């Protein structure tokens, strides 16, 4: 069980620390800081919605629904008899990522994103597109946790 809490705490601390660095050193609407060629950059953005900037309407609906989902996830893990390390790490990643983005939403009404993997940028069907959204550490933790959960579902949930 300690692994679950440790993983969630590590994600929260790393997420909030890197977002603070982005707020301090990257400016909104300015040039990206190129790290590797033109495909890995740091680009400051603020997201008031969920993944890919999708909106659920009122910010309060997003905060309440996220809180309920995270509370259910927390209770599920705490009361589960499953102590598989992969299970605990996976759910720790998801919980930590959800709390990390939740902190931003509660404090400022938006989530800071800054990691920009630009796989493709150009015209697609007559419109200018950047194929991959800008994201943050919390988003990465949630995505990795969800992917591992899907791939290893049978390993985590077989008796």
Curated annotation (Swiss-Prot):
InterPro entries: Peptidase_A8. GO terms for cellular component: plasma membrane. This protein specifically catalyzes the removal of signal peptides from prolipoproteins. Pathway: Protein modification; lipoprotein biosynthesis (signal peptide cleavage). The chain crosses the membrane at residues 59-79, 87-107, 131-151. The active site is at residues 113, 139. It comes from Chlorobium phaeobacteroides (strain BS1). Its EC number is 3.4.23.36. GO terms for molecular function: aspartic-type endopeptidase activity. This is Lipoprotein signal peptidase. One of its GO terms (biological process) is proteolysis.
């Amino acid at each position: 069980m300690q692994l679950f809490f440790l993983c969630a705490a590590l994600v929260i601390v790393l997420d909030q620390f890197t977002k603070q660095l982005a707020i301090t050193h990257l400016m909104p609407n300015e040039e990206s800081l190129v790290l590797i060629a033109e495909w890995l950059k740091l680009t400051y953005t603020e997201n008031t919605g969920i993944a890919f900037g999708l909106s659920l309407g009122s910010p309060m609906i997003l905060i309440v629904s996220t809180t309920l989902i995270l509370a259910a996830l927390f209770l599920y893990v705490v009361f589960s008899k499953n102590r598989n390390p992969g299970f605990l790490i996976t759910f720790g990643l998801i919980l930590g990522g959800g709390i990390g983005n939740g902190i931003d939403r509660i404090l400022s009404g938006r989530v800071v994103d800054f990691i920009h993997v630009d796989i493709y940028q150009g015209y697609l069907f007559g419109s200018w597109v950047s194929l991959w959204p800008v994201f943050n550490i919390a988003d990465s933790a949630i995505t990795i946790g969800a992917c591992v959960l899907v791939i290893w579902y049978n390993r985590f949930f077989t008796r």
